Regions:
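Hydrophobic/aromatic residues within transmembrane alpha-helices
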Residues: 56, 69, 124-125, 180-181, ...
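Amphipathic alpha-helical blocks and their helix-capping loop/short-beta junctions
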Residues: 192-277
Length: 326
């Protein structure tokens, strides 16, 4: 299986559990067996007293996790047009249960979000209580390009971004860097890509029997101080006022038209975002508008319930299969 688990013992006998996604050729895309295995192991670690901290990471330099392994889902949907294949129902149920369990995990849960953190990878990162990004981090919910919609709890975290930024990112699938992630509260710490082993060694040196939160925070703060000089420039907060004005509209059709005015913009970041939308799925755009609006008033559990229903309905519609093919 493309997922490995290990336990490292610290100086005081406490153990750190590490789960490593290891499907480098697919940028560590999540398959159903990987999701189930991770859920089982995290549940076991949560109940094991000697496990004091858990880390999620991805193998390879390109990505932590670039999403779910959707090809098999699409094949199943094509084989059962207009229906919800059993594989799809099982996949989304397992993925969302895993994501929800991360949000409520009872121990320190560190996610190392280097490289591409897309779709399902964002679901893992946002569920952790210590979300780390690096200079190589590129975060996005790019479902506008495949006829799905931003799921894995994105209804929750996008709807809670400042102003209209969540709506904009959902409609365009635009990438954000490590600085953006910190600024928008989509990450907690910025470390260098090469500091992962230093972090692990630091965790193993902590005294997990007393003042754990203070010690852990001090470790992370010290590591971040070494990295902060390499933090990239912010991309999206400086453009927030413009985006808020652009998307101060009454419906998704007006939002679509407003974003398309950016196609002639000299700001290439905005121009590229508009191109993502025009080349994307109109159905996804309608779903994004509605999910962002509804999720503001939902609990996290309600959000995942809504997303499960949405995902099953997307499987019934040919837009998803066609979007992945294209």
């Amino acid at each position: 299986m493309n997922l490995h688990f290990e336990e490292l013992t610290g100086t005081d006998g406490a153990r750190i559990g590490i789960a490593t996604l290891d499907a480098e050729k697919s940028l560590n895309a999540l398959s159903l067996p990987m999701i189930n295995a991770m859920r089982d192991k995290l549940d076991a670690w949560a109940k094991e007293p000697q496990i004091v901290c858990v880390m999620l990471r991805g193998n390879g330099i390109k990505a932590f996790c670039a999403g779910g392994e959707v090809r098999s889902l699409v094949d199943a949907c094509r084989a059962h047009p207009g229906e919800v294949p059993t594989l799809a129902a099982n996949f989304f149920a397992a993925e969302y249960r895993l994501d929800f369990s991360l949000h409520t995990y009872p121990k320190p849960l560190i996610c190392w979000g280097h490289g591409y953190v897309l779709g399902g990878g964002m679901g893992l990162l946002q569920g952790a209580n210590i979300r780390i990004v690096t200079p190589s981090s590129r975060l996005a919910m790019p479902e506008i390009s495949i006829g799905l919609y931003p799921d894995v709890g994105a209804s929750w975290f996008l709807s809670r971004l400042p102003g209209k930024l969540g709506l904009f990112l959902g409609l365009t699938g635009a990438h954000i860097n490590g600085r953006d992630a910190i600024d928008l509260d989509l990450a907690d710490r910025f470390l260098l890509d090469e500091q992962q082993q230093e972090l692990i060694e630091g965790l193993l040196q902590l005294n997990w029997q007393e003042q754990t939160p203070m010690q852990l925070n001090s470790l992370l703060k010290a590591l971040q101080q070494k990295a902060v000089a390499q933090m990239p420039e912010a991309q999206w907060l400086p453009r927030r006022e413009q985006i808020d004005e652009l998307l101060d509209v009454s419906d998704v059709r007006c939002a679509w038209k407003a974003i398309l005015t950016l196609l002639d913009h000299t700001d290439m970041l905005l121009n590229r975002a508009a191109r993502n939308l025009i080349e994307g799925s109109p159905l996804t755009a309608h779903l994004v508008w509605e999910q962002i609006k509804r999720a503001r008033h939902m609990s996290l559990a309600q959000v995942f319930e809504m997303e499960y229903t949405l995902s099953l309905n997307c499987c019934r519609h040919p837009e998803f299969s066609e979007g992945v093919r294209a």
